[in-house]
UniProtKB/Swiss-Prot annotation:
Sites carrying sugar chains: N33, N81, N101
Note from the entry: Antibiosis properties of legume lectins are proposed to be due to the lysis of epithelial cells of the intestine by binding to the carbohydrate moieties of these proteins.
Organism: Phaseolus vulgaris (Kidney bean)
Name listed for the protein in its UniProt record: Erythroagglutinating phytohemagglutinin
CDD domains: lectin_legume_LecRK_Arcelin_ConA
Family: Belongs to the leguminous lectin family.
Record keywords: Glycoprotein, Lectin, Mannose-binding, Plant defense, Signal, Toxin
Gene: DLEC1
InterPro entries (alphabetical): ConA-like_dom_sf (IPR013320), L-lectin (IPR016363), Lectin_LegA_CS (IPR000985), Lectin_legB_Mn/Ca_BS (IPR019825), Legume_lectin_dom (IPR001220), Leguminous_Lectin (IPR050258)
Lineage: superkingdom: Eukaryota
Signal peptide positions (record): 1-21
Matches recorded under SUPFAM superfamilies: Concanavalin A-like lectins/glucanases
Any Pfam family: Lectin_legB
Gene Ontology biological process: defense response
Amino acid sequence: MASSNLLSLALFLVLLTHANSASQTSFSFQRFNETNLILQRDATVSSKGQLRLTNVNDNGEPTLSSLGRAFYSAPIQIWDNTTGAVAASPTSFTFNIDVPNNSGPADGLAFVLLPVGSQPKDKGGLLGLFNNYKYDSNAHTVAVEFDTLYNVHWDPKPRHIGIDVNSIKSIKTTTWDFVKGENAEVLITYDSSTKLLVASLVYPSLKTSFIVSDTVDLKSVLPEWVIVGFTATTGITKGNVETNDILSWSFASKLSDGTTSEALNLANFALNQIL
């Protein structure tokens, strides 16, 4: 069975065994503090060191119409305009989404790569990423969403994990059997040689896993420098709310010459630990 520590260790061992990068960034948070984060709207760090993306009341219950985003404080170079190199950028994190007994979940959270200086967009099903569901090439946005509520205009009916490129309407999805209150461990990798983005989610206590992948040309979608982090929202109608907490997060970005495939190999390694 995989664990957060195993994923984090594997992530950094793989990166450290390759020394052909011109630019590399890595960090790992087992507890969060505000020093290394950019927090927007309702995002806070709890007294337990958890990254709480959306608001809760004094009783610890989630509130309606909450939107929060959080990013690593320093910009990340995702590709190099001089050499054309694109970064291999694996990340692993653990999150927990809980739902009150008298409620259904809404709306979800996402791991995102956005232009430096990006500000929150619309709440609810748009996850703070967009103002509408139409494709916008000027959004320069790549995200992996963990969507807990069906939105008729752009979502497939089951709850799902999706890859988003410049639109909340995912280019690829997989059904996600969401379980409230369970820790979910996520590994996302990008292989710069194949342009393959792979996202996997595991519920360790249940021994269930989900995976989605598609090709994404990061160099054509994103600016050279981006911010990386998370966004989450709660529902805008009564009876649809959830907590959205990130418990730990590891990230590494390494400019590649396009000849290695450590990102894809790492995804396969992680999946083999839990299948």
